[in-house]
Amino acid sequence: MTDEELHKLAHDLRTPLTVVEGFARMLERGEGRLSPEDRAEFLTRILEAARQMGDIIDGITRPRA
């Protein structure tokens, strides 16, 4: 993998990771003050970002033809 490819991969992973971190922090700070709907939305966003990271990892570990 070239340096350019590694840089793109790091960026592609960092984006959803930032989403996970941000929403997790909001859940942590809003404990007891967030509505059930907000909590559900934050958890949905975290799960979507985690799936996105999983898809990226699957894409780079899949054997190439």
What are these regions (language model features)?
Residues 48-53:
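Short alpha-helical segment of the dimerization/phosphotransfer core of two-component systems
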Residues 1-7:
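A conserved signal-transducing helical linker
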Residues 5, 38-43:
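DHp/HisKA histidine-phosphotransfer helix
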Residues 54-65:
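Short alpha-helical N-box/ATP-lid segment at the N-terminus of the HATPase_c
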